[in-house]
Amino acid sequence: MPSFDIVSEIDTVELRNAVDNSNRELSTRFDFRNVQASFELVEQTVKVSAEGDFQLKQMRDILRGHLAKRGVDANSMDAKTAEQTGKNWHQDIVFLQGIETPMAKKIVKLIKDAKLKVQASIQGDKVRVTGKKRDDLQETIAAIRTAELGQPFQFNNFRD
């Protein structure tokens, strides 16, 4: 029986490239002259630090633009609240990876509500979808792509 997996992953190499490009842009921008501002990537978290809250917002927009250029979906960003320590502001931006159980249940419910002839099962941090026909699986992929679930999904391990 044909099957595929629904996963939510971030390409860490592209994430690192986007952070490096964002740091390069900070060094050339006029409005960030003589300002201590930087992006730092630690595992799946980008630590943003600047001298003002307004600059943090600008830096998030810079990062979002570079993520889009590198093909990383910005919907996977989860920006924590900004904290002020002394004259500097810090913010952690966590990139979500994997499908949490509540989101996996939403996906399974979405597939069942679409009345497609496929079965969906939750397997850890991914959802496996199996069906008799390849066309049913492709309809399932289309249904999930059109649904606004607030997280980017990839479809891999497609088997006939």
Curated annotation (Swiss-Prot):
What SUPFAM superfamilies does the entry give?
YajQ-like
The answer to whether the entry has keyword Iron-sulfur is no
* Pfam families tied to this protein: DUF520
GO molecular function terms listed in the Swiss-Prot or TrEMBL record:
nucleotide binding
Q: Which CDD domains match?
A: YajQ_like
Q: Which key words tag this protein in UniProt? A: Nucleotide-binding
Q: Does the keyword Nucleotide-binding apply?
A: yes
Annotated Gene Ontology cellular component terms:
cytosol
Gene3D superfamilies per the UniProt record, alphabetical: 3.30.70.860, YajQ-like, domain 2
Its annotated function is as follows: Nucleotide-binding protein.
Q: Which protein family is it in?
A: Belongs to the YajQ family.
Q: What is this protein called?
A: Nucleotide-binding protein VV1636
